[in-house]
């Protein structure tokens, strides 16, 4: 999402780079911040691809580091992704004359509090509840009078209410039991479902579920 002149990527789902390439910017290199709500595999499936592609397509001799904001253990995960791409990094440096060093990444780990200052406008005001994964965090991105909350997966909790209070929109993952019927016993453990979305915050004005492409649910 874009806030002012800043472009944020929240979670690295499968296919996120293809979606970014199809957008108006056509490249993930313009992403100024990568925000990670938690370390479930589906949230970081394309993280390694993002690290390499962002690095290669910046086309600069001295590119700034890519900031990644996430929960504890994010730095370890990023390091593992880079290690897995070690041979490719060597190949890319050999092939591209403008690449002199491996990808530069700065990882910031938080569970609550304010992160950055204008024009960044990113705040983490508390953890969310997506057990058994812990900790998980939500992001509130603000630009001028507009604020959008992106929380990943969670169930209603006090910190989510606080994070989403008076926000213009809540972007949130939900699970639909009719789609994942074979694992329905697990569907209500750590995830919202469509009838419960609006319980996340009485003050939020919109929530969009994006867990299953083509099956989005919009709850006013």
UniProtKB/Swiss-Prot annotation:
- Active-site residues, as the UniProt record annotates them: 42 (proton acceptor)
* Pfam families to which the protein is assigned, alphabetical: Lactamase_B_2
Q: How does it assemble?
A: Homodimer.
* Annotated spans, Disordered: 193-220
Gene coding for it: rnz
Q: Which cofactor does it need?
A: Zn(2+)
Keyword field: Endonuclease, Hydrolase, Metal-binding, Nuclease, tRNA processing, Zinc
> At which positions is Zn(2+) 1 bound?
38, 40, 130
Task: Give the reaction(s) catalysed.
Answer: Endonucleolytic cleavage of RNA, removing extra 3' nucleotides from tRNA precursor, generating 3' termini of tRNAs. A 3'-hydroxy group is left at the tRNA terminus and a 5'-phosphoryl group is left at the trailer molecule
Q: Where does Zn(2+) 2 bind?
A: 42, 215
One Gene Ontology MF term: 3'-tRNA processing endoribonuclease activity
Official protein name in the record: Putative ribonuclease Z
> What role is this protein assigned?
Zinc phosphodiesterase, which displays some tRNA 3'-processing endonuclease activity. Probably involved in tRNA maturation, by removing a 3'-trailer from precursor tRNA.
Q: Which InterPro entries would you find in this protein's record? A: Metallo-B-lactamas, RibonucZ/Hydroxyglut_hydro
What EC number(s) would the UniProt record show? Answer: 3.1.26.11
Q: What's this protein's family per the entry?
A: Belongs to the RNase Z family.
State the free-text cofactor note.
Binds 2 Zn(2+) ions.
